[in-house]
Amino acid sequence: MTPEEEAKRLIAEYEAAQQDRRPIRTYADDQAGPDNKLYSDSGNAERLIALADGKARYEPSWGLWLTWDGQRWTIDHSDLQAQELAKGIAAQLRTRSNETRNEKAQKALHNWSIRSENVHGITGTIKLARSSPGIAISHTQLDDDPWTLNCQNGLLDLRTMILHAPNPDSLVTKLAGCAYDQAAPAPHFHQFLTDTFPDPEVLNYTQRYIGYCLTGDVTEQQISMWWGAGRNGKSTLINIVAAMLGDYAVTIGRDILIAQKHESHDTKFVDLFRSRLAVCVELKETERLDASRIKALTGGDTIMARRMRENYWRFHPTHKLLVATNHKPRADAKDFALWRRIHLVPFTKTVEETDVDPQLANEIIANELPGVLAWAAQGCLEYQQHRLAAPKAVVDATQSYKNETDTVEQFLTNCGIQAGPQVAGETSSTAFRAAHDEWCEDAGENPRSHWNKVSAHLKQEGCVNRRVHGGRLWSHVSMPGITQETTQYDR
């Protein structure tokens, strides 16, 4: 139903309910005397507020109206419903004018009805009404219950799995892609899961994770990375889960997660508002994760965003970050806070090209989404009991990934360098730096930034960089291939 049709329906319903077929009466209509608010934008605003109750709200920081469509609140970028409701007030005033016996009052009502339906009258009415407590609303009030999922057949309490009827007072703006039915079957989906996850512990973990994604809870502070070569089911599963979540799932660009010279525009974060799952597809192995950004997006800190030509506004995260990739991006292996968040889920089974069913995801989405949601809801209950303790396969894969990205350790190992209090040798800083820069050139690392990491690591291990005879030495560092004369000092 369009905003115009919805507004006309509301007006018709109200008129039918009035036995005397008079327009909406408010405080303004019941006042007597020359200074009543009957013939004013303020009086019209009160009529609009009464007519729009439970049907239209206004968010001042966005400068946007929201309308109730029977299941959720949706943004009305054109303000059509508010305008139609305001126009309906003019029609109501004309009806009252025709029914008024007092000739003077009839003329005044008729003139005011004409004034009320011109551009200035409609604009004035809407402008006054939108600041009313019954109309104005903060975006922080929208979708503010992290344990409610708005399904096609009602509001699902994720703690009890009980459905409740849609209610405008719930202030939900999102809608899942299917109805909730605890007994809904999904045979093809379950067979797909069995084929994709040969390790039952990883399958159980994945079910709990997707159940966690039904919620707006972010206490896990995690970024999940689904990794593996092509034809392993990860893209198919993501497409199915995203379809099941509907409005609650969004796709984000990889520039949000990858370190760049220039900051991403704040408009990129708007889609994260009240989402439950944010998916990033395919990162390059030459790209480096932006540790600060990932920690900010997974740590529960307030996110600042804005749409184009809009003031900044803030919100708390409700999304879970999920990366699906064939390649592992680079990451700072020494950043404990980052690696505490990363869970690498290996997709190890590759389907033979001749066995690939290109329509599998579409068939499941078309026929089995309620069953997928029932499976995810069970995972949500299990998550609430057991949280997201990672199975051994995920722990091992994540540790292996961390080792691969530990370029400092790779440099020390490849060059045969020993460092620590137990090492008695001293090494020329100049020779050490030259060997380091040569290694960086071969490894594709930036020498300057990587040297800072190496230096910080050595100092953390108890090594000392000291000045000797006009040169510098690294104490407690031993590097083969450097002569005794060079290790004594730099000239």
Sequence positions of predicted segments:
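Short hydrophobic short-linear motifs embedded
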Residues: E5-E6, L10-E15, Q19-Y27
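Feature primarily recognizes SF3-like P-loop helicase cores of small DNA viruses
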Residues: R22-S61, R94-R491
